[in-house]
A protein has these predicted regions:
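Active-site regions of enzymes building and remodeling cell-envelope glycoconjugates
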Residues: 177-178
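Positively charged, small/polar-rich N-terminal and surface patches that mediate targeting and assembly
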Residues: 1-162, 167-174, 183-202
């Protein structure tokens, strides 16, 4: 992400959610003999944690050489990497900045026709863009695993699109939620905070 023309907050959050889902549904992760399958299963069997890092200049093409899936969306480029233990993060990622990614909110795009995933961030919880993007990725992952199978299949077949639900009152979002993220409390918010929710509008 370059300083001169940064993407907006919402675009990064939506791209992060789509990148996570597309990585998890990639044949290399989803099929029994896929080369990413073991790493994903090990990660999902434990307490899931996601870390958002910012890459600029030559750091971005260096990072893109690592296994993962990149999503370009409304000016944002986000890459979800095959999960590893925190102690095993490749040096190409370890050198990237973690904290301090906080972008301006942009105008939301038009609401797409279903199938798409709606993700709402808790308006009573203050989070940086990096934190919010991680929460959106987690919400999309939970929706992928917990949603009704046929509805999830249609969403994936339609490109796994994601839209932040910024025009729906939070209490109404909570009523619609299929997936709820309660943060582990490692950064920015107390443990157990409800940070994001997701559902598949019909």
């Amino acid at each position: 992400m370059e300083k001169t023309d940064p993407p907006n907050h919402g675009a990064v959050c939506e791209a992060a959610a789509m990148a996570v889902v597309r990585l998890l549904t990639d044949p290399r992760a989803a099929e029994s003999d896929g080369e990413w399958r073991a790493a994903v299963r090990e990660w999902e069997s434990r307490r899931i944690r996601k870390v958002t890092r910012r890459a600029r200049g030559v750091r971005w093409p260096e990072a893109e050489k690592l296994p993962g899936v990149t999503v370009a969306h409304e000016g944002a480029e986000v890459r979800a990497f095959v999960p590893t233990a925190v102690s095993d993060v490749p040096p190409e990622l370890a050198r990237l900045q973690v904290a301090g990614l906080d972008l301006e909110e942009g105008e939301p795009g038009p609401r797409p026709e279903p199938p798409y995933a709606a993700i709402a961030l808790n308006p009573d919880v203050t989070m940086t863009t990096g934190k919010a993007a991680a929460q959106c990725g987690h919400a999309a992952q939970l929706l992928l695993r917990q949603g009704r199978r046929r509805h999830v299949a249609a969403w994936i077949e339609g490109g796994a699109r994601v839209r932040l639900a910024r025009d729906v009152p939070w209490r109404d979002c909570v009523k619609r939620a299929t997936a709820v993220v309660r943060d582990g409390g490692f950064t920015e918010v107390p443990p157990g905070t409800m940070t994001a929710i997701a559902w598949l509008p019909r």
